[in-house]
């Protein structure tokens, strides 16, 4: 019985690639040094899979930055601004496209489906000259072969590549990207021919866009593309892999009818309906790669349940045509549980990171072949039983409180305009009030203090003194700049989710559970393993301390429940919305305690609300309903005179504007500096959004200091769309990643720009 892994994390068990990349970018090491680290990582991954008995081992899933950018390099689809004149694409050009350079901006980056990974978006148009310009797929296949490992080269499929692209600057937005299919297929043919010549017997095409809402002409593009590739692919085993959701019946029919394709891969963890499609008909003689091991979470697989699913599929496709696989690439999970020395043993027994998932895939394949490892299966069953019955997972009081939420709307009793009137009487703010989003620069010294306190190298007294001084500095600075609503700067927080998770019960934290977000940047999501509750106040001490330093309003700063949920590894033994409601109740307790402590403005950030949107429209309604409801729960008991702010971090609101209004916040600040007036008109078109709105007036992601006149001009443009009594003036995001010598003049210019208007 055969086994397969869709893809594997690239960073290394201790983020070796991250450190090698950053050292190279900083000019501290050579290209050869970087290549050596990368080659060592690849060979250890291939060896690990070979040792685990995996039959179909992927190659070319490694990337120095991103697999879509690798495909752009393979196709020579370099945007004109980089002055590419052909030849093999090297590090300089590759990293310029990814990160920009001194004189040229980077290509755009956006989220990879609904994961927390980001890819570099190809910029295409009718003028692009496609040519085979990176031989990486073939080189890596040969590299593995030289190590004695026969791999399956993985390519981003041609249709998904185009569907994930955008029209380049200067090209009509409506340019039909799929019209470029005849231009890119010749390059794919060259790559396939080279792989064949190098000895490859199986090739994997990732076509994840098949799980999206597709129109008939888009589905036809898949049929056309693989019909065109058919003769080049003859003699090869060809796998088309899909993941992240189930397929519509039309997409399923298109996929299993593709010419020249011998195997189809499905995500059977998130794609629950796909199972029914397979059962209703699967082409005879073709292989089914069954993704039963979850590539997107960190929980141990329920091996007995997976085995039952696989056995039911075996009777449909035949014993020799079924391959056990992961639901998607393991890129989206942590690397290896072995490196978690501080994690509690009981919780650890419930988990499986990428290295453990490879073993699960192999164990399932062996069990199907009649060589079941009884000890492995019974250890798994024992871990699952312990997780089900552990008193650490269940909290009766939380269950009861969450159950009590059903059937109620949880909305503040009065309208937003009545509340704003009450708040204005209390806060007495000027027209065009100024504020910031929350965090201030985190200096090396500040990080050192936090690190030493965590490692118990300094006393609590020393820690509190240092943080207090930092808050005092930030408050004083804002008063000098004449900002109207202040923040305490969040010097005590390392991360907006981790800070709260560490103080809530039901959360666990890893030491090395890093997952790639983009390039060398990794995130370490908390693990929500049990019912969530708040043992004691989390932010009240620091916020009231900050308020005692000024007569101006001080914002309390909380992270919203949907963002905490979407940026964590979430328990899979109850629906996501139930976990979200539990977090909402904990944040509600905190908001009410802040209000009691005299904090009159409370910001509840929902930076990641949009990130949780299901991939297909059919799932949007239910998600938005419970996400918005969760936000409203957090402040339902707050008095009219207390102002609730929220902050959101993306520019595409058109399709969810009604849900944002339904959140019923008093003031909403948004990351708008890049998308400008488009977004503002959304708030006005047909929707009289009565609340305050603070579209970011400058982009904090850039070190550039915007001149006063430019900011004033931007504010005037905003006033052409929004009334002056609702407009707030603020940067577009927190200032944590900037330096004080950038922040001070930028905020000063912002306040000056708002005053005369």
UniProtKB/Swiss-Prot annotation:
Its EC number is 2.1.1.14. Its cofactor is Zn(2+). GO terms for cellular component: cytosol. One of its GO terms (molecular function) is zinc ion binding. It catalyses: 5-methyltetrahydropteroyltri-L-glutamate + L-homocysteine = tetrahydropteroyltri-L-glutamate + L-methionine. This is 5-methyltetrahydropteroyltriglutamate--homocysteine methyltransferase. Keywords: Allergen, Amino-acid biosynthesis, Metal-binding, Methionine biosynthesis, Methyltransferase, Transferase, Zinc. It comes from Kali turgidum. HAMAP family: Meth_synth. Belongs to the vitamin-B12 independent methionine synthase family. L-homocysteine binds at residues 437-439, 605. NCBIfam families: met_syn_B12ind (TIGR01371), PRK05222.1 (NF003556). PANTHER family: 5-METHYLTETRAHYDROPTEROYLTRIGLUTAMATE--HOMOCYSTEINE METHYLTRANSFERASE.
